[in-house]
């Protein structure tokens, strides 16, 4: 038995709701089943070609726990530049935590970056917290100078700060966050429910790949993906999930 990331076709429930599923199988016989339930105030519209990018980022730390070669099967083609960046990402984590994370080689159907639609719109994670509000406001009001992005949508993860099964708490937080976003002109708001934490990894070391993997299902709709930073260039620590040294390797196509 070899290491395999198997991606399943999207389950489209309505124009506003889609479920994505994938399973990571290791040569040792372990399996990690993951899902993303995606709902939106508008249409979801998932492009199957984007699924390989999304799930490879989503599972990269679990792959590194095993190490070795992984084949990716099912719908989706992995962006060439992302494949290179994930190799850099794995190399860095292997240097920082060699007893936990190992180098990996990913074999997948590839697509040249020129095949990925070039969009100027951005999507950002939005929890309703101070860092998320600052990021959204800063870009919507054009306060980031040359780095200002055309932020048109946000996404909130159920299974991150709020537990996957705490529906009542999440619904209240989502409703409040939606009001905040509408006040600054953002009407496209996604919710992604996921069982990422069930993989049993150190969340503080791995959560950023959940956020980026979740947003990368929209590669064909948005050209930029944002999340509030845990630290600045002059005050950050590593190893840590979100740090300026490695953000480009998972954020950029």
PLM-predicted stretches and their roles:
Residues 51, 55, 131, 207-211:
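Catalytic-loop motifs flanking and including active-site residues across diverse enzymes
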Residues 248-253:
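Conserved small/polar residues in nucleotide/adenosyl-binding loops
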Residues 243-247:
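Acidic, Ser/Thr-rich peripheral helices and adjacent loops at domain boundaries
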Residues 80-86, 134-137, 165-166, 201-203, ...:
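A short acidic (Asp/Glu
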Residues 1-121, 138-193:
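RNA-binding accessory domains that recognize and position tRNA/RNA substrates
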Residues 184, 190-225:
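Loop-centered beta-sheet repeat module
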Residues 123-135, 139:
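Glycine-rich active-site/cofactor-binding loop and its immediate structural neighborhood
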């Amino acid at each position: 038995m070899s290491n395999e990331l198997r991606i399943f076709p999207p389950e489209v429930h309505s124009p506003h709701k889609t479920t994505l599923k994938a399973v990571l199988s290791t040569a040792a016989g372990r399996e990690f089943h993951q899902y993303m339930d995606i709902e939106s105030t508008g249409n979801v519209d998932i492009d199957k070609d984007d699924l390989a990018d999304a799930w490879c980022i989503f599972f990269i730390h679990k792959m590194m726990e095993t190490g070795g070669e992984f084949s990716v099967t099912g719908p989706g083609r992995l962006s060439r530049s992302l494949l290179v960046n994930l190799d850099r990402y794995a190399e860095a984590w292997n240097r920082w935590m060699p007893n936990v994370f190992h180098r990996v080689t990913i074999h997948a159907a590839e697509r040249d970056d020129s095949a990925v639609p070039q969009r100027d719109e951005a999507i950002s994670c939005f929890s309703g917290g101070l860092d998320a509000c600052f990021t959204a406001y800063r870009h919507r009001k054009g306060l980031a100078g040359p780095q200002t992005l055309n932020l048109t949508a946000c996404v909130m993860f159920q299974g991150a700060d709020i537990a996957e099964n705490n529906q009542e708490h999440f619904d209240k937080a989502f409703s409040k966050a939606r009001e905040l976003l509408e006040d600054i002109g953002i009407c496209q708001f996604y919710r992604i429910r996921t069982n990422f934490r069930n993989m049993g990894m150190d969340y503080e070391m791995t959560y950023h790949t959940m956020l980026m993997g979740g947003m990368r299902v929209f590669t064909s709709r948005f050209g930029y993906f944002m999340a509030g930073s845990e630290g600045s260039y002059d005050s950050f620590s590593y190893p840590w999930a979100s740090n300026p040294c490695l953000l480009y390797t998972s954020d950029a196509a």
